[in-house]
Amino acid sequence: MFKLRTHNKQKKEQTIDKKALIFGLISVFLCGIGFGIIAPVVPFLVQPYTRNLREQAIVVTLLISVYAFCVFFAAPGLGALSDRYGRRPVLLVCLLGSAMGYLIFGIGGALWILFAGRIIEGITGGDISTIFAYFADITPSNQRTKYFGWVSAVAGAGTVIGPTLGGLLAKFGYSVPMYVGAGVTLLNAVYGFFFMPESHHKNNRIKRITFVRLNPFTQLASILSMKNLKRILISAFLLWIPAGSLQGIISQFVIDVFSWTPALIGLIFSIIGIQDILSQAFIMPKLLKKLSDAQIAMLGMVSEIIAYGFIAVSALLSLYPVFIIGMFIFGFGDSIFGPSFNGMVSKSVDSSEQGRVQGGSQSIQALARIIGPIIGGLIYVSLGHAAPAFMGVLLVGAALVVLYNGVCVNK
């Protein structure tokens, strides 16, 4: 088998299994399409079960929060299971569950069915921790941030195609993108069944799973007790709250402020995906040569603060060009923060703990994405369309201070 070769500082040869790398990237790409394809139509699927736009906005954000709530509880368990039994079986089961969740959401018929679909998606959506653990297994630590950047770029490619495709498919019915999303995710599972190699060798696996590893709260307490991770995770938590709010309200926002259709809503997510690709292809490699992971993360935070400012102005003045500029800037900040954050986290522990730490990290992100959409939805309907963006400026500013102080303390 052809292998990509890398070398560590001790000149000990390390190899990256090309087959594993290709599977991982294709899997992330298909996941990006599956997620993105449904994004433009969620408010329209909710509309028949609500009485007004205010109620519709609340339900849409609750659907996002329910998904994140399930990820919060599932991610540590999935990470622990992958540390014990390997990444392959966990990923396959999660992909099948996600396909089922999309299908149920598309069938609909009642509001509780939509929530049931999101719950199933959320329980199996914790597989993102296993995907990052998978890449941590197959990449040397000194190149891990670069490969996490590849993951971000490939996911970005999926989120370019997915929302655009979802917006076009919505012309044939708002449920059609959900069915196609289920099909794409199922295709990913079939591909993985035949071509995915196991990345987590048996001699690196944990011997047993304790309750502590399955409990998200004890897991969080354990991870936050690690001094080298605490400030990193707290800063990310503060950043993810407004990001969750933006994710939860953005489709409703452009409907209310700009009267956009599903096809135009798909454009929003495509912008973020395009920015991901451009950043990872042209910007991130140069940044990695000159800056540390922490410095890149802080640059991403500054970009997001500026982006939220543009989004707030677009809401106040109803100017969609300003909104689009803000989304490009947000996409840049998000695209460089994610790989640098995951690089910092993965380099903090050894291979036997990757699933646990990535699972805990995803739980923190999920917790923020539970809180974010709820707060964002409430202030959106009570304080105005610009309020969630102003919240983003304040919280990401606080996150920047936390991470900066953490970097200075470590030095």
Label for each model-derived stretch:
Residues 170-183, 378-396:
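A membrane-interface helix-boundary motif in multi-pass transporters
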Residues 5-18, 197-235, 257:
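Juxtamembrane intracellular "pre-TM" segments in multi-pass secondary transporters
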Residues 62-78, 270-283:
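Central cavity-lining transmembrane alpha-helices of secondary-active solute carriers
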Residues 96-109, 303-317:
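C-terminal ends and interior cores of transmembrane alpha-helices
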Residues 41-57, 248-265:
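Short amphipathic helix-loop junctions that connect adjacent transmembrane helices
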Residues 73-109:
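Conserved MFS/SLC helix-loop-helix module at the cytosolic interface between two early adjacent transmembrane helices
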Residues 74-86, 279-293, 380:
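Helix-to-loop junctions at the C-terminal end of transmembrane segments
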Residues 117-156:
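Cytoplasmic helix-loop-helix junction between adjacent transmembrane helices
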